[in-house]
Amino acid sequence: MNESSSMSQNESKSINSTNCQRLSIGQTSKKISTNINSIIINSQDKISDVPSETSNNQKQSFTEIQGIGFIGIKDKSGNKNGFGIQKMKDGSVYKGNFLEDKYNGIGIFYYSDGDIYQGEFNNGITKGYGEYYHEKEVTYYGLWLDDIQFGIGSEIWSDNSQYFGNYNNGKKDGIGTYIWADKTMYEGEWKDNVKEGFGIYHFKNGNIYKGEFKNNIINGYGEFIWDRGKKYYGFFKNEKKDGFGIYYWSGEKFLIGFFKEDKQDGISKYICKNKIKYYRWNDGKKSKHFLNEEHFFNFFRPSEKKYEVFFK
């Protein structure tokens, strides 16, 4: 029965290494200032100040960008309205549309450290569809709300690992699929950047787990299918068989019983080619062989009674 032990150490590590500790754009990206005037030196010498009215009652005002400043369209009141280029004190640059002195519409924001955001802005912050390019690390394509990922989006890392799914408050949250560079894959529910709820995990060796996850690891009821055809249906705790379960070697050979930390522990019913045997196990070792079914059921513990129907 040692052959039935669940995941290998490598498989267990693979489940845990969702790379969620890697860059999460919503957690590490820089907030875009909503107060443009606070980061502009307004004493730049104007090249020209054209007073002629445009068709939308605006005038063009060009301010030379010598390290810091703005070049673009201002209205009569001096507010930035329309297309412009804004350079900040830290070297960041915004190119795009303005409305009442704030980024509004489509634009590109170049961070001083090399990161780039291009997409929609609303009232000075990222909102709507946008793409974030983190230098040499990860790219995010998707929806934003108040400067963080919110809604459907995808991330692609430099090693070609990728995630597609839902985000909430800058974290993977909801339904999503994560594919590692070695083609290991998780499809299922997420909460606060970790696997939480129901999911399907495809190991690179062909094994598959379908079931519950808790805090990024296998916990609860699930089904583990080995690539060689063996199967386990039952409960897990900390990625090990723990509780009631059924282990199949083949259609004619299977065991119904209890497990603890991946070992048989408690009563079990063993069926092989229509022959039935009853056992009690202790830490993976047989401690008692029951003579018949009646003898077997007389030894049920209170905690085992609810599973009695599965042994009949």
Residue positions per predicted region:
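Intrinsically disordered, low-complexity repeat tracts enriched in Gly/Pro/Ser/Thr and acidic residues
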Residues: 1-312
